[in-house]
Amino acid sequence: MADIIDIANPTRTQAILNQYGLHAKKKFGQNFLTDLNVLHGIVDVAGITSEDYVIEIGPGIGALTEQLARSAKKVVAFEIDPHMVAVLAETLLPYDNVKVIENDILKVNLAHVIATEFGEGAHVKIVANLPYYITTPILMQLLRAKISWDNIVVMMQREVADRLNAEIGTKAYGVLTLTIQYYAQAQLAIKVPASAFNPSPNVDSAVVMLTPIVPETVVDNPDKLFSVVKGSFAHRRKSLWNNMLQMFGKQEDVKQRIQDALDSVNIASSIRAERLSLNQLTALYEALKLQGLIK
């Protein structure tokens, strides 16, 4: 395939866009990556080999997909824009190990897709150049999906990348930080300049690699744990107590059970959630369960 001009080549990217009368759509957060060094870096960071099954999110016109296909055993790419799906049918024609699925990744049962495309219980690597406006919901879904993944390598807005490893008490510290801490270790792998894209975004970007970890404290139902975490941060400037009342109600018996739960884990009701560690919030979750506030 040495004679194939890379899709990411700026001239070819523009030719493809012109051929199909396409332009980057703001509603899908589209920016086309045209820097081969960055693309090769993403593949290298993910450690893609000929034995790997890869899920890609948001292939666009196929610049990253092409690089993945050259290294992976099989790539399944999810694209929400039907116009891009039509383009991909042509740009990825040389690669018989790629399948493009037109769907919103937030509506996909990944476990089912993986079982169907790769085999029951298959391990996958997930690679994505995510639309910045929807990065957090997609990351949350990937982390909480009941699938086996070796790593997740994601291009995202630098500001979001900074939130992944934010320190307690900082403005960046929140639900996303805590979710990452429970499921994964985050590493900022590549800093990406705006000039790497067509059109250039107004923000800096970064490639982050997530690797799975065993949680320090495993809970019976992570979804319920993070429902409590989310509720605790619902109003960042309010105390944990006020957010708890909003979650569970203001009846006197409920207030007493909330207070008993807080006392049992030595958390002051006046504290804000941004001052609490994952271990503290996990302990609070267990205490709230013992009080019958979480079924």
Swiss-Prot record:
S-adenosyl-L-methionine binds at N31, L33, G58, E79, D104, N129. Coiled coil: none annotated. The keyword Coiled coil does not apply. It is an enzyme of class 2 (transferase). GO terms for cellular component: cytosol. One of its GO terms (molecular function) is RNA binding. Transmembrane segments: none annotated. It catalyses: adenosine(1518)/adenosine(1519) in 16S rRNA + 4 S-adenosyl-L-methionine = N(6)-dimethyladenosine(1518)/N(6)-dimethyladenosine(1519) in 16S rRNA + 4 S-adenosyl-L-homocysteine + 4 H(+). Disulfide bonds: none annotated. The keyword Translocase does not apply. Pfam families: RrnaAD. Its EC number is 2.1.1.182. It is found in: Cytoplasm. Keywords: Cytoplasm, Methyltransferase, RNA-binding, rRNA processing, S-adenosyl-L-methionine, Transferase. InterPro entries: KsgA/Erm, rRNA_Ade_diMease-like_C, rRNA_Ade_Mease_Trfase_CS, rRNA_Ade_methylase_Trfase_N, rRNA_adenine_dimethylase, SAM-dependent_MTases_sf. SMART domains: rADc. HAMAP family: 16SrRNA_methyltr_A (MF_00607). Belongs to the class I-like SAM-binding methyltransferase superfamily. rRNA adenine N(6)-methyltransferase family. RsmA subfamily. Specifically dimethylates two adjacent adenosines (A1518 and A1519) in the loop of a conserved hairpin near the 3'-end of 16S rRNA in the 30S particle. May play a critical role in biogenesis of 30S subunits. This is Ribosomal RNA small subunit methyltransferase A.
